[in-house]
């Protein structure tokens, strides 16, 4: 059987693709730098606090955190260890499953999230949302939903991720 012919990107498509990659890299680096400077936490740490804040009892299994962030369990474990040392999170055995581990946000973690959220939202608006018209932003959301739907269709293992986005 013959391999399918490669459909190369046009010049415009290549420029748009590179702009997307560069823009996302610069955006996440900038948001991370702003949070570190103002509050002493990374963007990844902030995102863990957000996920915990949205969970019942501000608690989640470590594996769920890793899945929702698309990070390895090892990476999340290292991040949570730092956060635990800073008093932002505690870890305990998962209820009903001694093999599982849950991370729970402390009051100190909650207070830091409440303090850092305006910095983060201001950065997201200034460096991303407010740069596009409502129509452009809606189109981008529609495109990213199409990307997610496609990737879910070809890899059902990603379904848990979609549940954490909606």
Where are these regions (language model features)?
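Short, hydrophobic-biased segments on the C-terminal half of alpha helices
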Residues: 62, 80-81
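C-terminal regulatory/oligomerization modules of transcriptional regulators
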Residues: 1-11, 134-166
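N-terminal leader segment of winged-helix/HTH proteins
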Residues: 1-39, 86, 165-166
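N-terminal helix-turn-helix DNA-binding core of bacterial DNA-binding proteins
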Residues: 29-72
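Charged, amphipathic alpha-helical coiled-coil/dimerization segments
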Residues: 2-5, 81-139
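Alpha-helical linker/hinge and terminal dimerization helices associated
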Residues: 24-27, 31, 69, 112, ...
């Amino acid at each position: 059987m013959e391999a399918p012919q490669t459909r190369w990107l046009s010049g415009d498509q290549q420029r748009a693709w590179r702009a997307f990659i560069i823009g996302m890299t610069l955006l996440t680096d900038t948001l991370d730098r702003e949070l570190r400077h103002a509050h002493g936490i990374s963007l990844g740490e902030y995102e863990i606090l957000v996920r915990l804040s949205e969970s019942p009892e501000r608690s989640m299994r470590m594996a769920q955190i890793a899945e929702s962030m698309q990070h390895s369990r090892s990476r999340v474990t290292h991040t949570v260890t730092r956060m635990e040392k800073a008093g932002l999170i505690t870890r305990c055995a998962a209820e009903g499953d001694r093999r599982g581990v849950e991370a729970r946000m402390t009051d100190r973690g909650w207070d830091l999230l409440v303090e850092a959220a305006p910095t983060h939202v201001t950065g997201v608006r200034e460096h991303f949302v407010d740069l596009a018209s409502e129509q452009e932003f809606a189109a981008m959301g529609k495109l990213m939903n199409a990307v997610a739907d496609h990737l879910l269709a070809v890899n059902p293992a990603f379904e848990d991720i979609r549940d954490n986005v909606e």
